[in-house]
Amino acid sequence: MQKSFARRAVVAAAVLAAVLASAAPAHAATSWVTVGSDRARPLDESQGLTVIRRGGTVEYRYTGVGTIPPDVAARGFDHVGDPDSVNGWYVEPYERGDHSGKMFRAQSPAGAWTEYRHALTAGEAYNNSWSAITPDGTWMLAGEWGTMNRLLGFPTPGLNPAAVAGADLPLAFTVGLDHAVRDVQGCDFLSATALLCASDDPDGTLFGITKPLLRIDLARGPDGAALTGHVTALRQLPLSSACSGSFEVEGIDYQAADGTLRVIVMSPSVCVVFDSKTWRLKQG
C-alpha cells in the first residue's frame, strides 16, 4: 500500500512538473546584468546603434533624426531605424512618412553609399524599425511595428548577389514566431541561430513585464527559406531617469568581441534631453 502510494506520488509529481513546464509563459530568469551606461543624445543617438569594424579601425555609429541626410529626407524617407554592420558593411533601415515603401541604405567598407528600395508586399506593415545581419553576412532580418508574429528576411545589401541596387529588394522569407512580440525597436544576432531584441512594449500583457529584453532562438540559421523562432523574455530593460513617465526603448547592439550588449533607452518628458542612456549589459 505504501509502495503503491509512493509510486502514484512520483507519477503525479512528474505529470505536474510537465504541465507546469508546458503552461509556463515564455519568460526566463534574468541572465543579463546592467554594468553601466552612457548618455544618449536625443538628436543623433536616439534610434539605433552598431559597431563598424574595418581593418584596424572600430567605429561606434548611432542613428537618429539628426543623422538622416537632407537629400534622403527630401525624398520622403523621414525615419531611420536601428542599423547593423558585418564584415565592414553597414546597413541602416528607412521608412517613409507616406507609408509607400521601405529603403535600406548600405555603406561599403570603402565608404560608398548605395540605396536598396523595397516595395511593400501584401499585408506588410510600412514600418522599418531595424535591421540585423546574419554573422556570415548573407541574410538580413528586419521588423515591423505593433504586435507581430513574424520577422522579415531579405538578402543583405552589398553582401548577397540577390540584392541588386536599382531593383526591388525582395522579401525572401519570414521567421514565424511561436509567441507574439510587440513594438520591437531593434534586434542583433547573439549567434548564428539566436537574436537579442529590444521591445518597447508599454503594455506588459505578452510576457508579464513592460519593455522586455527578448531572445529569439531560430530553428536554424537563415538560409533564404521560411523558418521558425522561439521567443523568450529575459528581463525588463533598465528604466532610470530623474523624470517620471513613459520611457522609449530604442535600438540594440551586441558585440561578441567583449560580450557587451548595448541598448538605447530614451527618458520621459524633458529628461529626454538630459539623462537618456545607452545601457551596457553583460551576461551574469
Can you annotate each of these PLM segments?
Residues 1-28:
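Secretory targeting and sorting signals
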Residues 36-64, 78-82:
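Beta-strand-rich domains and repeat architectures in extracellular enzymes and scaffolds
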Residues 37-44, 71-76, 118-125, 174-180, ...:
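Surface loop/turn motifs at the tips and blade-to-blade linkers of beta-strand repeat domains
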Residues 46-51, 80-82, 128-130, 184-186, ...:
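Conserved beta-strand position repeated once per blade in WD40 beta-propeller domains
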Residues 64-101, 115-121:
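Blade-loop segments of beta-propeller domains
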Residues 67, 98-106, 147-157, 203-219, ...:
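Structural motif
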Residues 179-230:
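Loop/turn-rich, solvent-exposed surfaces of beta-rich toroidal or solenoidal domains
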Residues 225-255:
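Conserved blade-ending motifs and adjacent loop-strand segments that build the rim/top face
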